[in-house]
Amino acid sequence: IDWSALGFDYHKTDVNVRYYFTDGKWSDMEVTSDEYIKMHMSASCLHYGIELFEGLKAFRGVDGKVRLFRVEDNARRLRSSAERLCLPLPTVEMVVNACVEVVRRNEAYIPPYGTGASLYLRPVMFGTTAGLGVKPAKDALLIVYCSPVGAYFKQGIKPILVAIDREQDRAAPRGTGDVKVGGNYAASLL
């Protein structure tokens, strides 16, 4: 891999990990090399946006050790997003274990220290219940996959000064502005 030429895009790695929620309980972790999923054409995620995702990175340090950046924080936010979308709640431990396992099994894709590249992890969860009408999904799939990536902005970014107001919130109460769901991003294409 030419680490210096990587952009922010998907590159196949060896495995991804999955948990299935059916019949009121989570499955054991499944490790697979399959990049595809099979689901019903009326799955709730396809029609009603019952989908969420996270994004975090693994880095190799100057000492050669691999470090995950804020994995527990991402796991808690994933749970918060799942709760908001009425999806089954994975434990923080499940999400952390999935992230650790996908990094461990794809260690060859972690860029060397100093390249500016990283291993990007994408936990994604969605309702898989077949049906019509907006209602909570009874079934779900949680996947964690990864990809080596370069900088999101290849040309870099210019820092700016901002004021942060922790007393005000622009997100609508009980809306989706403070959770990480795909629908929040679709409008950016307009």
Per-segment meaning from a language model:
Residues 108:
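Non-catalytic nucleic-acid-binding/docking modules located in mid-to-C-terminal regions
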